[in-house]
């Protein structure tokens, strides 16, 4: 988004934390960033606040914005309330007006909690399927024969997550029987 002209109030790396061990030492700083962000939104008086993913940060900002203004709130990427902590949807509905969901089955969960919700699709799911020619080219490029098993390791996007989980993924890969 910065590449498209958005000015960020701070580096997003400040929020790329996982687990209590990373969050606790920075708790006060994170609380300050939430307050600063909410105050900036309230001062700007936008027609709508659109928050994107990062529910632990964004939903706290939205709560403060709703408490201090009449700004409509839209959240892109529904939290996985269908998988765990279902009560989050009802809490979220107190300060989120509309949700843009990645998956069609999320819409009823959000609506049942009291939010408007539209299924907008997942960027990866929108990709066209691989063609047989592309699959053959991939097999040839990497020396795979037809029917060869292939393991894909997707460690995540946060540096701390990759650093922490990388060795575990490596051990898992080493133990995998791909024969």
What is the meaning of each model-derived region?
Residues 137-179:
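Active-site donor-nucleotide binding/catalytic segment of nucleotide-sugar enzymes
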Residues 1-139, 154-162:
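Active-site and donor-binding regions of nucleotide-sugar-utilizing enzymes
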